Amino acid sequence: MDVCARLALWLLWGLLLHQGQSLSHSHSEKNTGASSGATSEESTEAEFCRIDKPLCHSEDEKLSFEAVRNIHKLMDDDANGDVDVEESDEFLREDLNYHDPTVKHSTFHGEDKLISVEDLWKAWKASEVYNWTVDEVIQWLITYVELPQYEETFRKLQLTGHAMPRLAVTNTTMTGTVLKMTDRSHRQKLQLKALDTVLFGPPLLTRHNHLKDFMLVVSIVIGVGGCWFAYIQNRYSKEHMKKMMKDLEGLHRAEQSLHDLQERLHKAQEEHRTVEVEKVHLEKKLRDEINLAKQEAQRLKELREGTENERSRQKYAEEELEQVREALRKAEKELESHSSWYAPEALQKWLQLTHEVEVQYYNIKKQNAERQLLVAKEGAEKIKKKRNTLFGTFHVAHSSSLDDVDHKILTAKQALSEVTAALRERLHRWQQIEILCGFQIVNNPGIHSLVAALNIDPSWMGSTRPNPAHFIMTDDVDDMDEEIVSPLSMQSPSLQSSVRQRLTEPQHGLGSQRDLTHSDSESSLHTSDRQRVAPKPPQMGRAADEALNATSSNGSHRLIEGVHPGSLVEKLPDSPALAKKTILALNHGLDKAHSLMELNPSVPPGGSPLLDSSHSHSPSSPDPDTPSPVGDSRALQGSRNTRIPHLAGKKAMAEEDNGSIGEETDSSPGRKKFPLKIFKKPLKK
């Protein structure tokens, strides 16, 4: 028990002794620190009075100088009294966390590479922040430091720009007790912002805030406007491209219609060639029929001359009379349907020349239209190639090439439509002119032949332009209208010849079979009337009057004696009305003669009341005044004396005209003759 008490007392005494020693040691340290603090304060005050003597008595300025001195001490790592470039760069990177301190470094040093405490204090006094008012400091606190909750505290303390260095150093009394900042992050943030402001001046954000806001707003407006403009231009470009594609499709359709028209022209050309071949065959067939008619007429003539039976001759004469009458009826009908005005041959050549000149002008217009079409196609292909590039759509939308190509397409389309319409109108117009004039105009020997035929100076016509081979048309469109089937070539061959040719050519085979005796003169009258059609209107008028007077006064006998049928037909005029009147008179006389023969079929030749009783109608009659019933040669007729002296001469002239009528019908180069089939081969009994 005693031992334990003693141990406890020894321990308590040791503790008290150790505590006393520690208290004495701390007291001695406090005295030493107080003495050193007093010494540092005295040295700081002396240095401040040396640097800035007018402000060395101001307590606030002393605190600010001490804060600047502490900042300089933080930056001076080697404690040599100067801050060099390396030390400032290290301080900016490590303490202020500047990754690119080039601007701040140049602002801090300037031209002086070593910064002392005096240099740092003078720089601080020259700074704009040193002269800040309380409001400016509060504005800096709100906008730059972003601590608006301490605004009231700053206003109560009336902190100006002079107190900024005290905020830049670590001072627990200032930040904790005076400013009442309990949040450590707020104290650190305020210290860093104040240190940056003291060393490098006021922040740029504070000085140029409005300018930057204005520039930001302007940039946003420009960006939005640019996006909107790009959107509008893109939409306009798409719409324009759609419109251009529609125009291209319309142009392709017009081109296709022109190709279709070209194909139709080719088909019409083939039909035209087929019709020409058929026309040649038909002409050959008609010539064969004419030869057959001539042979039949010769056969009838031989039968009439070889028989001695009057009834047989009368029968053949009646058959011949019926055929002639039928031919006259056909000629009369054709004369009624075609009794119109006949254009002169010179008009045909002039119209053909006019057509060729119009074709030249049409070819020039067509070539221009096709050239515009090629240019528009090339422009469209270029735009398509540009659209495939990276900025092609934007470039096309902002350039004028799209409008130019669109204009070229519309121009080419309009020109192509005009050429197509002009082609159709020209073909229709020349077809109507051919129908009205009755001859071919589109199919002609060519402009050079026409110029030579009309005796025109070639210099008036100019030089014809060659047809280019690189155009769209596969064939020569210069002769489009010539490839169209002429309306005259599609008609019947009988309609292509004039009325004068219809009345003339079918009589090639009637040459010598019309020389009958007085008993056969009634039947041969109608046949001989169609031997010739010559342009002799005065003779035709007299012949028609003689025929009418003879028929009305003394029957058909005086008609035969007074007017020979060959001379009557020879005097047919060109006038359709007068020719029609003559044919009607001849039909009346033929009908009357035929009725008289039917009333007296059994009367012998010597006692016929229609003939002169003093003349014989036998082929063996010895009377020299009796006309030959055979009439097979003009020499035999010229050697005999007839009762009517001029009758034989006119008949001889008719035979001569009949021999050369084939050559006369082919003398006109502009017209082709198609004779009528007026004889039918009678059945042999």
Swiss-Prot record:
The residues forming the signal peptide are: 1-22
Task: Name where it's found.
Answer: Cell membrane; Endoplasmic reticulum membrane; Sarcoplasmic reticulum; Cytoplasm, Cytoskeleton
Q: Which PROSITE patterns match?
A: SAM_DOMAIN
Q: Where is the EF-hand domain?
A: 64-97, 102-126
Determine if Phosphoprotein is one of this entry's keywords. yes
Q: Where is this region: Contributes to fast Ca(2+)-dependent inactivation of CRAC channels?
A: 475-483
Biological processes annotated in GO = activation of store-operated calcium channel activity; detection of calcium ion; enamel mineralization; establishment of localization in cell; intracellular calcium ion homeostasis; ligand-gated ion channel signaling pathway; monoatomic cation transport; myotube differentiation
Ranges of biased composition (kind: Low complexity): 32-41, 490-499, 608-620
Q: Where is this region: SOAR/CAD?
A: 344-442
Which Gene Ontology terms cover its molecular function? calcium channel regulator activity; calcium ion binding; channel activator activity; identical protein binding; ion channel regulator activity involved in G protein-coupled receptor signaling pathway; microtubule plus-end binding; protease binding; store-operated calcium channel activity
Where in this protein does the record put region Disordered?
A: 24-43, 490-542, 596-685
- Residues annotated as carrying Phosphoserine in the record are 257, 512, 519, 521, 523-524, 567, 575, 602, 608, 618, 621, 628, 660, 668
SUPFAM superfamilies reported for this sequence: SAM/Pointed domain (SSF47769)
Please tell me whether the keyword tRNA-binding is annotated for this protein: no
For this protein, the record's PANTHER family field holds: STROMAL INTERACTION MOLECULE 1 (PTHR15136:SF9), STROMAL INTERACTION MOLECULE HOMOLOG (PTHR15136)
Protein's name in the database: Stromal interaction molecule 1
What lineage does UniProt assign to this protein's organism? Eukaryota, Metazoa, Chordata, Craniata, Vertebrata
